[in-house]
Amino acid sequence: MPLPVYSSRLIEIELPTTYEIDPQRRLVTSRIWGAVTDIEIHQHNDTLRTDPKFDPTYRQLVDMTGITTIGVSTSMINETSLDQFFSPGTRRAFIATDDAVFGMARMFALRAEGLGQTIQVFRDGELAKEWLGI
């Protein structure tokens, strides 16, 4: 009977989230696209909060216009809204053009506001940038 063959080669999987930290502009720009689930949101937040360049007082711009499928549970929205790592009062703008994505973002923003978060959801990216002052 042949023995199983195992490979030590790593397989890279591109998650549908990225972020960029711009210390000069004091801005975190996050982008979320494709089919998004609890796992991707959790991993994005954990990676961002532990990035040595991250500063919780930086503003955030979240581009959600490329999301095609929402697989994020209500419990994840509740959990992440209570687990804030941006400083209270820091402006965060979410851009969502799809109605379902917009609603999910608003649900998150409303829950997070109770912890002093300042989050606005926009359908227009230029208005979001104007509100952030960028």
Predicted regions and their residues:
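Amphipathic, Lys/Arg-enriched alpha-helical "gate/interface" segment within cytosolic domains
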Residues: 2-134
